[in-house]
Amino acid sequence: MNYKMHLTPEEEEILNGGKGETMAKVMKTLVMYGDAFGATKMVPVTSKMGHLVTSFGLGVMQPVYDLMDQLIAGGALSSQKFSVDPKPLDPNVPSSFLKNIVFKKFMYNMQDSYDAQLAKLGLIDSKSYTCTCYMDEVGNTPKKGDVLSWAESSAVVYANSVLGARCNRNSGIIELFGSIVGRVPYFGLVTDEGRKATWIVEVKTTKKPEAQILGSAIGMKVMEDVPYVKGLDKWIGTELDGYAKAYLKDFGAATASNGAVGLYHIDKLTPEAVEQGESLIAEGAKVYVIDDAELDRVKNNYPVMWKDKNATPKLCFVGCPHLSYDQLVEWTENVCESLKKNGRSKISIPTVFTAAPAVVEKFNATPNAAKLKATGVVLSYICPLMYMNNPLAGKMPVITNSNKLRTYTTSRYYTSAEILDIITKEAK
């Protein structure tokens, strides 16, 4: 094949079939991908583990399953163990007879066989289904400077920004191919130049901005560009502690889903901003000022996709991306306190908190698990988005504090404080 980038002798050998026809096809795909984006060469994937975005066994994805079979048969397995996005189903999550038929017979009817394929390709274990693979409890936490082959947008933006790893916003399958060959094309966010900020965002709010709305505003403004955010340290500090990481997790997911951000820098907080400061800002960077009025404008312009905009919510999802352990504890305390204040013992709207299986396991080993269960809240490991993809679920009035879930589904966004108020008061 004709290609523009420079390949090492070892890479050329793989491309020419030296490690089998299947590996040659995988390498050819990566070379074509890199050429399309102007990559000059391939660079090694240096992270200990990979992560895949496609976790759901949709019946219509037969070409994907055929491809997986070809990879397995050809010995083109992942060179690194990997985690994968959350599973789509959990019997504990509120559903209906008809919804379950759609889920199991028409939508995710290939889940078991696909799970088996993932295990053969290199899945870490059955607890490794989460969009927040970087959580300490999960153990797939890249080091600063690690080159990754990931695709899940919320994980990519977190790894790039909060951990200082290097990864492009790859597509599903491409990220698996990078893990198989152990190389990715050198372009975009993998390069020094590609990590320069072309936007300066000045946060000038009078109170701590809601992570989901701030991220949404920035994502919609800068799209796929890199923003350098000033003024946020006033509200979330200059230490990357558990609180700041949880805030940035949700903030980043909103920038990535409401826009296409793959990397952001937070002045005085994120690793590269601490080390390099404003030298990360490219010449001619645009400026976006965010004040209280701008955040209100953004939130007030979210469309309501419900047929009846005044309907009583039938379901609430909290945890997209998956909640951290500290967030689970905080939500449990807040729900219990709010119920007590309102003279109630149970939530008024079916509510599901989602977190990584390993985080759920840790939480369930504490007294807080019984407290949360007593309120009626369901704790699950699923992907709320995969649940909402059911056409019957999409017709329901569902509420969430996730801007990502709002963007991709018919669910309605409320702030965390608003969600807490809604689910702990008498349903109207």
Regions found by a protein language model. Name each.
Residues 1-428:
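Non-transmembrane, aqueous-exposed alpha-helical and coiled segments at domain scale
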